[in-house]
């Protein structure tokens, strides 16, 4: 079977611990046997980030801007315990945060729905996609500890010297406290809005945008005004043509409505809100192991995909001891497929897109049709006996068998069409 040619490169960002183990298996068994692809490889393991003073994370981000598509393995964000474990030079920032700040764009998280797998929220029949603004707010904030009595002020001085703002924020008592200053930019918010509206059009789904503008009357209301103005100027007629809607909601109201709904919509959220709610949605649909995460810029030209979960440290410890593991690799497989499909769309190569879709179907059918699954999914079905689940590698092998049969069948169909 000849390999499918991928015209332009894909940036590959390797990661840490158990996800690094399954990453290698996916690449060797599901990707490279079928694709002739130039992978621009960057090792984002915690050891390599420490060795390069985190330069490798920045380099991989700029490579993504250059080539347009990246696929990322889960990585460790170090805390004090990890600093000691790996003897790190410093507590390096989250790689995802660094990547998001360089690329900009919006992070969209979407559940992978397998009908056989029960949902914690049973009436969520359709996907709920969470769009998370990938810039600013708490994630670029400056925070300080206040250790004595004094005044906290907020100052702004314009570059032209014509405007100076000096506001008293709070007068601290002797016991001190904490303070934080955070920001966002109109350009970034507009890009966030554009990416959200574009995805709603592409998926033909209603879009909700959430803030707490009743409390943050300048900060959050600026988000709302930018969204509303862009919608009225550029998207209102397009939405009406598709019979979909856009609506701003207070976040507390939206979360309550989301829990009562059947799904089938997109929620655009500010950075922190999206971070929290995407995990809630993932759990409601079953598992973080069944959640995709993509970052896309407003112009659609820069794209990065990854699994929404972490590095699965507990399983990695078992792997290190030579013990059997049963780690769910579905979200990591979908990280690869979403990057492959995007690459195919940008390159206008239908066979690359078709391969990505076939690999997704092979993965889902392995569970839904074949009944082969990892331990976490078996437990969700109430099955606890050892025969009800397969190991980490066995699951990927089952997907590989199903994919091979689908690829052979697809090639036979092509030959039949040629004879006709």
From Swiss-Prot:
Reactions that this protein is recorded to catalyse:
D-threo-isocitrate + NADP(+) = 2-oxoglutarate + CO2 + NADPH
PROSITE patterns recorded: IDH_IMDH
Q: Which cofactors, if any, are listed as required?
A: Mg(2+); Mn(2+)
Q: Which UniProt keywords apply?
A: Glyoxylate bypass, Magnesium, Manganese, Metal-binding, NADP, Oxidoreductase, Tricarboxylic acid cycle
Residues bound to Mn(2+): 252, 275
- What EC designation does it have? 1.1.1.42
Q: Name one GO biological process term.
A: fatty acid beta-oxidation
> Molecular function terms in GO for this entry?
isocitrate dehydrogenase (NADP+) activity; magnesium ion binding; NAD binding
Where along the sequence does the record put site: Critical for catalysis?
139, 212
Report the co-factor binding details. Answer: Binds 1 Mg(2+) or Mn(2+) ion per subunit.
Indicate whether Metal-binding appears among the record's keywords.
yes
Q: Which sites bind substrate?
A: 77, 94-100, 109, 132
Query: One GO CC annotation, please?
Result: mitochondrion
Report residues binding NADP(+).
75-77, 82, 260, 310-315, 328
**InterPro entries annotated for this entry?**
IsoCit/isopropylmalate_DH_CS, Isocitrate_DH_NADP, IsoPropMal-DH-like_dom
Q: Which family does it belong to?
A: Belongs to the isocitrate and isopropylmalate dehydrogenases family.
What does this gene product do?
Answer: May function in the production of NADPH for fatty acid and sterol synthesis.
NCBIfam families linked to this entry: nadp_idh_euk (TIGR00127), PRK08299.1 (NF006156)
Question: By what name is this protein known?
Answer: Isocitrate dehydrogenase [NADP]
**Gene coding for it:** IDP3
């Amino acid at each position: 079977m000849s390999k499918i040619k991928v015209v332009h490169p894909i940036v590959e960002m390797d990661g840490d611990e158990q996800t690094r183990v399954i990453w290698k298996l996916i690449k060797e068994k599901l990707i490279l046997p079928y694709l002739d692809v130039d992978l621009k490889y960057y090792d984002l393991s915690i050891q390599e980030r420490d060795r390069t003073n985190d330069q490798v994370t920045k380099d991989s981000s700029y490579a993504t801007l250059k080539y347009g598509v990246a696929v990322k393995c889960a990585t460790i964000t170090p805390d004090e315990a990890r600093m000691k474990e790996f003897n790190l030079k410093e507590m390096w920032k989250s790689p995802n945060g660094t990547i998001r700040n360089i690329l900009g764009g919006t992070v969209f998280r979407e559940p992978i729905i397998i009908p056989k797998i029960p949902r914690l929220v049973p009436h969520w029949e359709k996907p709920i996609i969470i769009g998370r603004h990938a810039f600013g707010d708490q994630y670029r904030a400056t925070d300080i500890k206040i250790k004595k009595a004094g005044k906290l002020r907020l100052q702004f001085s314009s570059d032209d010297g014509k405007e100076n703002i000096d506001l008293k924020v709070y007068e601290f008592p002797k016991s001190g406290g904490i303070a934080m200053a955070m920001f966002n930019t109109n350009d970034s918010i507009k890009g966030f809005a554009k990416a959200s509206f574009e995805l709603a059009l592409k998926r033909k789904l209603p879009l909700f945008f959430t803030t707490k503008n009743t409390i943050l009357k300048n900060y959050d209301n600026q988000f709302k005004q930018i969204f509303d103005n862009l919608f009225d100027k550029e998207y209102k007629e397009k939405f009406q043509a598709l019979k979909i809607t856009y609506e701003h909601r207070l976040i507390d109201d939206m979360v309550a409505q989301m829990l009562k709904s059947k799904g089938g919509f997109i929620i655009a959220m500010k950075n922190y809100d999206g971070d929290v709610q995407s995990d809630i949605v993932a759990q409601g649909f079953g598992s973080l192991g069944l959640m995709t995460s993509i970052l896309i810029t407003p112009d659609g030209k820069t794209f990065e995909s990854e699994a929404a979960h972490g590095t699965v440290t507990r399983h990695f410890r078992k792997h290190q001891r030579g013990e059997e593991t049963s780690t769910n690799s579905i979200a990591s497989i979908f990280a690869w497929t979403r990057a492959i499909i995007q690459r195919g769309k940008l390159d206008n190569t239908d066979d690359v897109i078709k391969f990505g879709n076939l690999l997704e179907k092979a993965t889902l059918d392995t569970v839904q049709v074949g009944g082969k699954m990892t331990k976490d999914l078996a437990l969700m079905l109430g099955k606890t006996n050892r025969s009800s689940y397969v190991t980490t590698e066995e699951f990927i092998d089952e997907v590989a068998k199903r994919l091979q049969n689908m690829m052979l069948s697809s090639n036979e169909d092509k030959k039949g069409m040629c004879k006709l």
